[in-house]
C-alpha cells in the first residue's frame, strides 16, 4: 500500500509517521505548535530561540538555556517514592523560593503563555520548549509526548543548589529517579547552553551586575559537547568548575563523581548527542504518577484543518477548510488533492470536492528536521437536505496510483447537528457596563430534529492569579436560546455574554444535547470573530 511505502521512507525513528493516528485527536493543537514552525501557517514557537544565542532581553541572557533550566527546576521536585511532583508547571507558584532565583522562569512562561490553551497545557509547553530549544541549537531531536496536567499550587522544595555537597546532590537526583551516571549526564547536557547570572549568584561570579554572565563553555550558543571536552582537557571556563570559592563548584563535584568515567564517555560527540536526547526525554517525561502521557507526537501525514460547515442562503450549507498534507517525502508540485464525501445518511456521493493549493508561500509550512507540509484549500456548498457526514482524502501524484486516506476506515467526520454561524457571531469592542466589559455574542444553527435539546456554548475563562505568570483555565457554560423560525431545516440559537476585555481572545465549544447524545464543535476561537454581527441572509 502506498502509505506504507511513504512511512518506510521516514526520518529519524522518533519522527516516523504514526499510522495509528485518527482525526480528530485531543493533541492536534500540540502537534501543530511543534511542527508548524514557519511558512504558510506558522505557530513560530522556535522564534524565541532563533538564533540559538538569542534573547529578547539582551545579550546577557540566552532563552534556549532558560527554557531548559525552567523545565528542569519544574521537574526537580519529583519524588519517585510518593509519585508526587514532576513536570507540572508548579514552578510558576514556587518563584519566591531561594532555589529559584532570577527572571528566567517568568521569562519562559511569558513566551509559552502565548500558546497555552485548553488543548495545550503549560506543562506540555514547558516540555515542548526543551524539544524546540535543543533542535534550534543543533542538539538532539527529543521525543515529545503530551498529556501533562498543570498543578494549581506549589509543590515541595527540592531543586539542587550549587553549595550543596556531592552526597546531597546524589540523594536529590536519586529522589527524582536518576542514578549517578544519569545525574552527571543531566548536568553536562543541561549546561551546554547559557551560563551563570551574576545578578542571581554574585557569590559565584564575583559580580552582581546585570551584564555579568560567564558562560559554561566556549560554545555556549551551540549544542556541542565542549562542556565535556573542556572539562577533561583542564580548559574549562565553567564557574561551577573553576570558581574561586570551591564551595560553589558543584559541576566539578558532579562531573567527577565516578572518577570521570561518564564524562569520558560523553567526549564522543555522537554518544553525547544520544545521551542528551535520552536524559532530556527522561526529564520532560518525569511527571506525577497520576498522569499518563501519550505516545510520541509525530508529524501527521494527512490532517484536516479549520473545517467550517455553516448554514447559508437558499437552503445551502457552506463547507470550507483545508487539508494539510505532509510533503516531506513528496514533490508537492506533482500532487493534487480531492475529497470524496458521504451525505447525512452515510451514502457515498458520486462527485468529489476539488481543492486548490494555498498560494501564499506556495501553501507550505516548515518544521525542524526538514519537515514540509502543504495545504490544499476548498470552498463548496451542499443542499441542506443531503449535507455531509464524513469524507476521505484522495491524494493524486502524477504518474502514480491514487492514495486514499480513510482516517483508519472511519472517514474524517463532519457533524451537521450544530453549526457555528460565524457571521452572526461577534465581539464588539464596546464597553457595555460599569465593569468595563464587552459583549460576546455566539450564534449557532441547530438541525430541526434536535430542537428541544439543550444548546449552550462552553467558554474558557482565564483566571489571573496575582504574582503567578500562568493562568488557571475554567470552563463556563452559557445557555443559548432559540432566535429564529425554521430556516432550511435549521433553527438559529444565540446567547450574549459580558466578558472582561482581557478575556477577548479565548476558545469555546458549541454543545448540543446531554448525556450520551451530545454533539460538539470544539476549540473555536473568539479572537477570529468580527466586531459586528451580521444578519442572516
What are the functions of these language-model segments?
Residues 1-22:
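Fungal secretory targeting signals
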Residues 18-537:
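Catalytic cores of secreted/periplasmic or lumenal enzymes
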Amino acid at each position: 500500500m502506498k502509505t506504507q511505502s511513504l512511512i518506510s521512507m521516514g526520518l529519524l525513528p522518533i519522527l516516523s509517521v504514526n499510522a495509528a493516528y485518527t482525526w480528530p485527536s485531543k493533541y492536534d493543537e500540540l502537534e501543530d505548535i511543534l511542527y508548524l514552525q514557519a511558512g504558510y501557517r506558522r505557530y513560530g514557537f522556535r522564534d524565541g530561540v532563533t538564533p540559538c544565542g538569542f534573547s529578547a532581553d539582551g545579550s546577557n541572557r540566552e532563552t534556549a538555556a532558560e527554557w531548559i533550566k525552567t523545565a528542569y527546576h519544574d521537574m526537580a521536585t519529583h519524588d519517585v517514592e510518593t509519585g508526587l511532583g514532576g513536570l507540572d508547571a508548579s514552578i510558576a507558584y514556587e518563584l519566591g523560593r531561594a532555589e529559584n532565583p532570577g527572571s528566567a522562569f517568568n521569562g519562559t512562561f511569558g513566551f509559552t503563555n502565548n500558546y497555552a490553551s485548553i488543548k495545550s497545557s503549560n506543562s506540555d509547553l514547558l516540555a515542548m520548549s526543551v524539544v524546540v530549544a535543543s533542535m534550534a541549537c543543533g542538539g538532539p531531536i527529543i521525543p515529545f509526548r503530551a498529556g501533562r496536567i498543570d498543578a494549581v499550587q506549589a509543590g515541595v522544595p527540592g531543586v539542587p543548589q550549587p553549595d550543596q555537597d556531592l552526597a546531597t546532590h546524589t540523594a536529590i537526583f536519586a529522589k527524582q529517579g536518576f542514578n549517578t551516571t544519569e545525574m552527571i549526564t543531566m548536568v553536562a547536557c543541561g549546561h551546554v547552553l547559557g551560563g551563570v547570572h551574576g545578578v542571581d549568584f554574585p557569590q559565584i561570579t564575583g559580580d552582581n551586575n546585570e551584564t555579568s554572565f560567564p558562560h559554561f563553555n566556549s560554545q555556549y550558543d551551540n549544542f556541542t559537547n565542549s562542556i565535556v571536552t573542556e572539562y577533561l582537557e583542564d580548559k574549562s571556563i565553567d564557574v561551577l568548575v573553576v570558581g574561586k570559592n570551591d564551595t560553589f563548584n558543584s559541576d566539578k563535584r558532579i562531573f567527577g563523581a565516578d572518577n570521570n568515567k561518564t564524562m569520558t564517555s560523553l567526549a564522543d560527540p555522537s554518544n553525547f548527542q544520544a545521551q542528551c536526547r535520552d536524559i532530556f526525554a527522561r526529564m520532560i517525561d518525569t511527571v506525577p504518577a497520576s498522569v499518563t502521557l501519550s505516545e510520541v507526537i509525530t508529524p501527521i501525514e494527512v490532517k484536516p484543518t479549520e473545517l467550517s460547515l455553516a448554514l447559508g442562503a437558499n437552503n445551502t450549507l457552506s463547507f470550507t477548510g483545508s487539508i494539510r498534507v505532509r510533503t516531506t517525502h513528496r514533490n508537492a508540485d506533482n500532487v493534487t488533492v480531492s475529497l470524496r464525501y458521504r451525505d447525512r445518511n452515510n451514502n457515498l456521493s458520486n462527485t468529489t470536492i476539488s481543492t486548490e493549493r494555498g498560494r501564499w508561500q506556495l501553501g507550505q509550512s516548515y518544521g525542524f528536521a526538514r519537515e514540509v507540509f502543504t495545504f490544499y484549500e476548498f470552498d463548496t456548498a451542499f443542499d441542506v437536505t443531503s449535507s455531509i457526514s464524513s469524507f476521505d482524502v484522495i491524494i493524486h501524484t502524477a504518474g502514480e496510483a491514487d492514495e486514499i486516506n480513510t482516517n483508519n476506515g472511519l472517514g474524517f467526520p463532519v457533524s451537521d447537528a450544530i453549526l457555528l454561524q460565524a457571521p452572526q457571531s461577534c465581539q464588539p469592542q464596546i464597553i457595555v457596563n460599569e465593569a468595563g466589559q464587552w459583549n460576546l455574542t455566539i450564534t449557532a444553527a441547530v438541525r430541526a430534529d434536535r430542537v428541544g435539546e439543550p444548546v449552550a456554548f462552553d467558554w474558557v475563562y482565564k483566571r489571573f492569579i496575582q504574582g503567578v505568570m500562568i493562568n488557571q483555565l475554567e470552563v463556563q457554560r452559557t445557555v443559548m436560546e432559540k432566535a429564529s423560525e425554521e430556516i432550511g431545516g435549521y433553527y438559529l440559537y444565540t446567547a450574549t455574554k459580558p466578558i472582561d476585555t482581557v478575556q477577548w481572545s479565548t476558545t469555546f465549544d458549541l454543545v448540543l444535547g446531554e448525556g450520551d447524545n451530545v454533539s460538539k464543535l470544539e476549540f473555536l476561537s473568539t479572537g477570529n470573530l468580527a466586531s459586528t454581527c451580521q444578519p442572516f441572509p
